[in-house]
Each structure stands twice: as C-alpha cells, then as structure tokens.
Swiss-Prot record:
Its cofactor is Zn(2+). It is found in: Cytoplasm. GO terms for biological process: rRNA processing. It comes from Burkholderia lata (strain ATCC 17760 / DSM 23089 / LMG 22485 / NCIMB 9086 / R18194 / 383). It holds the Pfam family YbeY. Keywords: Cytoplasm, Endonuclease, Hydrolase, Metal-binding, Nuclease, Ribosome biogenesis, rRNA processing, Zinc. Its EC number is 3.1.-.-. This is Endoribonuclease YbeY. Signal peptide: none annotated. Belongs to the endoribonuclease YbeY family.
Amino acid sequence: MTLHVGAEPAPREDDTEDALREPELDLSVQYGDEITSDVRKTLPKRKLIAEWIEPALFASAQLTVRFVGEEEGRTLNAGYRHKDYPTNVLTFAYDAAPDGTVIGDLVLCCPVVEKEAHEQGKPLTAHYAHLLVHGALHAQGYDHETSDEDAAEMEALEVDILAKLGFPNPYQ
C-alpha cells in the first residue's frame, strides 16, 4: 500500500544527460523499538537491502527502510489507512526533490512478513526481497490498486526484477 504525501509519480523517461546515469540510492535503515537484537540478526543487512532495491529504481532515490513489530505496524496502518491490523509493507511516498530524486519510507512489519513467508512456503529472504522491490516501485508512483492494467504492469516489473536477482516468481 502506498501513502502519497503530496507525491507525484517519478518520471520514467528523460531525454537529458541525467537519463544516461544509473539511478543512485541514498539508503537509511531503521529498527522500531519492538525489534530485538535477536530479530535484527535475522533481517537483511543494509548492503543486501540496497542490492535488492537498486534494480527497481528508475530514478535516483532517498529511501528509509524501517523494520517494525506488530504494535507499530498496526498503529501506522490504522493511522494512515484506517485499517486496525499490521500489514506487511507500507510505502510513504513524498514529493520528489527538485532534481527528481524520489523520496520515501518503506515500513516492513517483521512478524507479518515472517508469518506470510511461512504460510506461503517461501524463504524469508525471498519474501523480504519481494516486499522491498514492491515498496520501491510504490515509492516511484507504481500502484496495483488503481486498475487491473496497473496491477499487471507492477507485477510484471516485480517478477522481472526478482528473476534478475535470482528469486522465483512471488505470485506462483
């Protein structure tokens, strides 16, 4: 789910010299109060998170990834989406910087991600990779809830990016 805070979709094509440069990622990683040191040991590290997100970027981005527990996940989902339960990933997309840099926060609720991975028979690593790619696409304006065509486009991008990263199709 994407929460747009005055955000416009990131430009996908540009005919200037900047379009020839690879998108750059300025990444911060945070941990909510509920994330114990034992849980942190099981989470992907910053370098791996960046390796998963970078192929999903079509513009430079300044992103914060925050890992949270059920309480914070529920509070955020209730406060911003009016749904009183934690969800796997929330994306907060903000207005792009003047240079077009995408700015956003990706919040992943660890207990929900772990439960889904177990229920779906997926490796936890693969599920985190999928949700980070999914969230990065949301931060750039992609949306799967506006139309079937948009959902198909976003899913196809996710499947392609994850395949390049060595992960199977998350929708099968």
